[in-house]
Amino acid sequence: MQRSHELFERARQHIVGGVNSPVRAFTGVGGEPPFIARAEGPYLYDEDGNRYVDYVCSWGPMVAGHAHPKVVRAVQAAAADGLSFGAPTEVEIRMAEKLKAMLPSLERVRMVNSGTEATMSALRLARGHTGREKIIKFRGCYHGHVDALLVQAGSGALTLGIPGSPGVPAAVVEQTITLPYNDAEAVRECFQRMGDEIAAVIVEPVAGNMNCVPPVPGFLEALRECCDDHGSVLIFDEVMTGFRVGVQCAQGRYGITPDLTCLGKVIGGGMPVGAFGGKAQIMADLAPEGPVYQAGTLSGNPVAMAAGLATLALVDDPATHRALEEATATLVDGLRERAEAAGVSVSLNQAGSMFGLFFTDQNPVTTFEQVQACDLEAFKVFFHAMLEEGVYMAPSAFEAGFLSTAHDTPAIEYTLAAAERAFARVARR
């Protein structure tokens, strides 16, 4: 990949680490990243002319595949009318109406520019609404690079082996309580000790930043029960799971209604966007109606709203999500069969069109500790073998994989043929 190598060398002269988000630098797997020139459907094409079946999907947003004609046309039409106004527009109303129609828990909505902004703002709102300061998060869950939440985080922080981050004052995180994910009893014990001090519980209902770890039965129910009993705000970070694991996101899939929901990724169709919303009584505390301040220069950007609306229209259908889930199951089952045939121990998880591959003999994988104990060296061998075969998976053992509606039978069959050879390489190492 000569051209990609040259671009990476050039990037490192001007951009910190050569990338604008750490995981893209391949720190977790070694080697150098391909630089992408374009994408279409389920495929990426790099600067050296190589084609890859893409299971990163821009880290989740591209649920309808890359460069979907309807999304592209919507963006072109919106851009022709102006890129940003800093003033109210009809399209942001339409987006709010669409989100509320698809997700009944959203009584009121506020658009922002990223998932990090959404979680940061939701936490501030929960603290302002309750008058409390303590928050609960879970080990291995990542909610963006918010100071108060960058504690035992997943995603890139986990890939780089950073349990927290320099630059985050101890005073900022001393009100953050970190508990084990999928441990309902630990949550109940914490609430028994200090429930009346807890402003909010924030959780990824499917943990997608320590690979893909769905909730065990009873875990989300315990969060809802404890928050109800103590007047705390339950926040679902559905930035990743939103419209990924079902028409009504993870909350619809598992039947648990949060007080606030954070969204991003899919609702922008590939454009920078985020949103948070929930109970009208809580959202009423947000400026300009209430005292909790939040603002953004580009919030509700008309081009991002147009891309998001076009994308949501493509997946606002239970049949579409069933087909996505079936395609993902075909991939997951095929990977499991080929690993077993090669004599390689793996465990696979799935939630909708998200999946996780773990090199371990523990099955199922349900905890952060199990994820940390996986064979990272085996993953590195598998990752590079797949990349050489033309399959682009997340360059970290701690990131989930994704499918899109564009991942058809030929793409999946190609992937499984490549995986058969990749697992054989893992077995020989």
From Swiss-Prot:
Belongs to the class-III pyridoxal-phosphate-dependent aminotransferase family. HemL subfamily. Its cofactor is pyridoxal 5'-phosphate. Pfam families: Aminotran_3. The keyword Transferase does not apply. Homodimer. Its main location: cytoplasm. Pathway: Porphyrin-containing compound metabolism; protoporphyrin-IX biosynthesis; 5-aminolevulinate from L-glutamyl-tRNA(Glu): step 2/2. It is found in: Cytoplasm. GO terms for molecular function: glutamate-1-semialdehyde 2,1-aminomutase activity; pyridoxal phosphate binding; transaminase activity. This is Glutamate-1-semialdehyde 2,1-aminomutase. NCBIfam families: hemL, PRK00062.1.
